[in-house]
Amino acid sequence: MGLISYFASFLPDVPWHFWGSVDSLLQGLVGACAVSVLYNLMKVHLYIVCLNDPDKQKEAAQLRAQSPIMDFLHLSLLSLLFSLLGPRVGALVVLEFSLRAVSMVLSANKGAQSSQLFLLCQFSLGCGVSCSLDYLHEGAPHRTWNLLLAVGLSGLILWQSRRMCRHVGILYQLHSGERYCGVCLSLLACWRDIPPFLWRALKVAFWVSDLAAVAVINRDFLSTSEAMRFWTPLTICYTLLVIYMQEEQHQNPSEQMAYQTVFVRMGGLLILMMTVGRWADILHIFISLTGELWCLLHAGVMLRLCREQDFAERMSNPRKYPVSRAPKSTREGRTLQRETSLEE
């Protein structure tokens, strides 16, 4: 330690705000790595699903044709957005998505999984990871070194997931038929276990993120009354948003509806921040809107596949998904038929 301090004494002093910017960039990079790992694992799963369906060979070719340059651009853009996004707005995005996800799962099938959620939660997952790191490292003496270690670990996991994704896209068909590759044989046996694994991992991630989000928001308030003035309109706004979006999703579950939902969510959050927030929060909301739209655009083919998969499961399991009651005209026709039979 004495030798390190001796050499460090010759280095120029770095201002504190520089280290704050470096820490924000490292947090954003970890959040972007988490989103990319989720994306790669879902891509592997959906690619194998398409290979097993003769009618989806075109989608399999589209998934296989995605270039590494787009993946690098995806990682770089998300890292920049997460580093610029303030922890306050990031915490609000995490809480809003958690409430919406719980509502979607409960209304769908009493806890059933929806494959669309794995892709709709991408930006919220990155916000949650960045927000959790900001809260957990608040006041830490070696904050930058800890974040560098987190970047190294997340980068290693991302590298392995990308390597598996490229391997599956190029050689899975050959190796699964020849049965001599350990990776492809493992995926051939347990590729259906990828969504349950991601589901459990996302539960833990959002549980930690929600706790960190509440703590990050509450640290700006000096009294309970001030916190209540913020949380009361926030709760009302989020509840109304979830109810509205849930009805729209049931009536029109399309790609256009996914983008419309993003604009409605960010618009509601913008109005709320203009009422009880700060001017910096408004800028961060536009950054969040850019990230949400980019994640949906980048996962367009996969979102369409997930939507079709959810619809097929809903049609194949009518008992799990309750059908609507018979229309009024049908009931009136049955009543008229009974009355006619009684008169005869």
Swiss-Prot record:
Residues 317-344 are annotated as: Disordered. InterPro entries: TMEM82 (IPR031648). The keyword Repeat does not apply. Its main location: membrane. It comes from the Eukaryota. One of its GO terms (cellular component) is membrane. Keywords: Membrane, Transmembrane, Transmembrane helix. This is Transmembrane protein 82. It comes from Xenopus tropicalis (Western clawed frog).
